[in-house]
């Protein structure tokens, strides 16, 4: 359904003026509340024989931004789809480069998508609600998973302690 979607494939072909597009990866991102923007970043490029499966991400990005490995670079179009609307959670991106003003895709995001080159375009997630009066601090080992009590809620646990609970409808998908 997702990797072979006709409109997404057509958008990828048009974006690169290409004749062939081969879908290869599907990620699903669930985002609970974050009160600050995530860092602006680029995703991980792929080169002939080199991907994040066998090469550190910092090295892949260095290879990409140096321009020295362009002839081995595999062009990738990324389709980011939003399945629901939540408080906040917009997508800020710099299609004209980091020296220009960003654009933002926010509000009314359910069942929308953007197709582009997220391996070469800086982007970031804007704050996602629901917003609390106090920050919820967790470590990098925190996990988001369905609650095991049958409530249908999702919980963020950190070190075995529940730090945040929310219905799935409030999680950015």
Go through each PLM region and give its residues.
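A structural signal for well-ordered alpha-helical segments within the folded catalytic domains
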Residues: 2-10, 77, 109, 119
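Short, hydrophobic/aromatic alpha-helical segments in well-folded domains
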Residues: 11, 65, 78, 94, ...
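A generic short-segment signal for beta-strand/edge and adjacent turn/coil regions
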Residues: 44-52, 59-62, 80-85, 139-148
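Proline-centered turn/helix-capping motifs that create local helix->coil transitions or kinks
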Residues: 16-19, 84-88
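Short, structured patches in soluble enzyme cores that scaffold and shape functional sites
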Residues: 30-32, 81-83, 95
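Signature of the catalytic double-stranded beta-helix
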Residues: 1-72
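Extracellular structured ligand-interaction cores
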Residues: 23-25, 37, 74-80, 88, ...
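Catalytic core of Fe(II)/2-oxoglutarate
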Residues: 86-173
